[in-house]
């Protein structure tokens, strides 16, 4: 997959590309195990969010009794900067009681809960669980827990903007809005309607201090995606979107 977008799936390659593009750090998402020993990343390059995906929760059919304890072991680690939830794939509402102790732990350790919102990668997942309005309920009920609305709820842009605007404890990342290689001038010409809506709804939130750059790598070329986000965010907000917000929200200490 990485090769299809002009990259190599290796730490050495990413370190080189990060240096060339001026990227200083990354947050690894989508981890498929709760074993702490399987989460060892170069500390100068990555933090990670421990992921509760369908392989961990078996689409909501099998919840480990010690799930909160396992998650807490990760949150205790300096290299773990949050939790990642996949409600559409697990077919669990974000208000399901199984998540309550996770939200409390995130609050206690002052680390965010990132949530996959919007479209899913395969048809068997259920969109109703990953709709931005599902996140609104969890954010409203847990006002002292920080949430990151991954993918800005795409394509539910209007609802995503409403959730971001309403809830001060919600941030949004702009990862995964493209897939594959892209020629930006052509893209913004052919997809002018969608791009215009996306840009307008982002601007409508007046929340550039809570909007984060992200990629969903390896589905995009990093250099091209930086250019894509630069066309969506006003230049005066680039430092916040590309660095300051993620550094603050995920507590990276950079």
Per-segment meaning from a language model:
Residues 29, 86, 244:
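Conserved residues at the C-terminal ends of beta-strands
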Residues 18, 83, 106, 151, ...:
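Conserved, mostly hydrophobic/aromatic
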Residues 18, 38-40, 75, 139, ...:
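N-terminal cationic-hydrophobic initiation segments that often serve targeting/anchoring roles
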Residues 1-25, 78, 200, 204-212, ...:
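Mid-to-C-terminal alpha-helical segments outside catalytic/metal-binding sites
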Residues 11-15, 34-38, 68-72, 99, ...:
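Generic structural signal for well-ordered alpha-helices
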